[in-house]
Amino acid sequence: MATTWPPCRIIRKSGGLRGMWTLEYELQRSGLGPVAGVDEVGRGACAGPLVVAACVLGPGRLEESLDDSKKLSAKGREMLFPLICRYALAYHVVFIPSVEVDRHGVQVANIEGMRRAVAGLSVRPGYVLSDGFRVPGLSVPSLPVVGGDAVVACIAAASVLAKVSRDRLMVAMDADYPGYGFAAHKGYCTRAHSLALTQLGPCPEHRYSFINVRRIVTRSNTRAVAGFTPAPPAEHGECR
């Protein structure tokens, strides 16, 4: 009879910050390690890249400090970032540019980013844990964990790597495209960002497949920076 991995007992044992290592440990003990966590940031932004990170942590590393990167302060994430880079057995960060998000759609770009992040690890994982949804096409077994960035250590580490990497890029982007406030809102659709979009029109880093960006382009008949032609969108999205 076929065996389903990981066994249900492993899933039941994991959960909560105390159990952050339980799922990874049980997978390792079952001969399915090393275990990699993968997570993304920037799905709901209407500007900037989608950033995906994969991470394989050493046993017992940073458990008490890790949590979903969205719950940590910016200072806390910045403090954790070099520690994760130092103590992780392997990690890899992938940037999916806005034009690729427009061409393929957020979901397809997200899955492709996760594949690339896992493929880029210097240590081949035996098992992959992803945050929230299944990642088809991986060369190793995988399991989605709902809310994984808050209950699985390697996913939490990947979440921090992705969040800090993207935030730093958006701060640098603010200097390249002044007036949009990228350093403050990181490309998400705040009131200030919407106002800047209306006044300035979109720049090459905006996602034209997102309906709020397309609406402004259509309404104002605005052109982006000279020489840039947005790719036709594969699907529509909107900032959340």
From Swiss-Prot:
Catalytic reaction equation(s): Endonucleolytic cleavage to 5'-phosphomonoester
Which GO MF term does the entry hold, naming one? Answer: RNA-DNA hybrid ribonuclease activity
- Entry cofactors: Mn(2+); Mg(2+)
Pfam families xrefs? RNase_HII
Where does the UniProt annotation locate this protein?
Answer: Cytoplasm
Q: Which UniProt keywords apply?
A: Cytoplasm, Endonuclease, Hydrolase, Manganese, Metal-binding, Nuclease
Give the record's GO CC terms. cytoplasm; ribonuclease H2 complex
Domain RNase H type-2 as annotated: residue spans: 33-222
Intrachain disulfide bonds: none
Q: Which positions does UniProt annotate for a divalent metal cation binding?
A: 39-40, 131
Gene3D superfamilies (UniProt xref): Ribonuclease H-like superfamily/Ribonuclease H
What EC number(s) are associated with this protein in UniProt?
3.1.26.4
Q: Which CDD domains match?
A: RNase_HII_bacteria_HII_like
> What GO terms in the biological process aspect are recorded for it?
DNA replication, removal of RNA primer; mismatch repair
What InterPro entries does this protein's entry cite? RNase_HII (IPR022898), RNase_HII/HIII (IPR001352), RNase_HII/HIII_dom (IPR024567), RNaseH-like_sf (IPR012337), RNaseH_sf (IPR036397)
Record NCBIfam families = PRK00015.1-3 (NF000595), PRK00015.2-2 (NF000598), PRK00015.2-4 (NF000600)
Family membership noted in the UniProt record: Belongs to the RNase HII family.
Q: What function does the entry list?
A: Endonuclease that specifically degrades the RNA of RNA-DNA hybrids.
The record, for HAMAP family, names: RNase_HII_B (MF_00052_B)
* Protein name, UniProt field: Ribonuclease HII
The lineage is:
Bacteria, Bacillati, Actinomycetota, Actinomycetes, Mycobacteriales
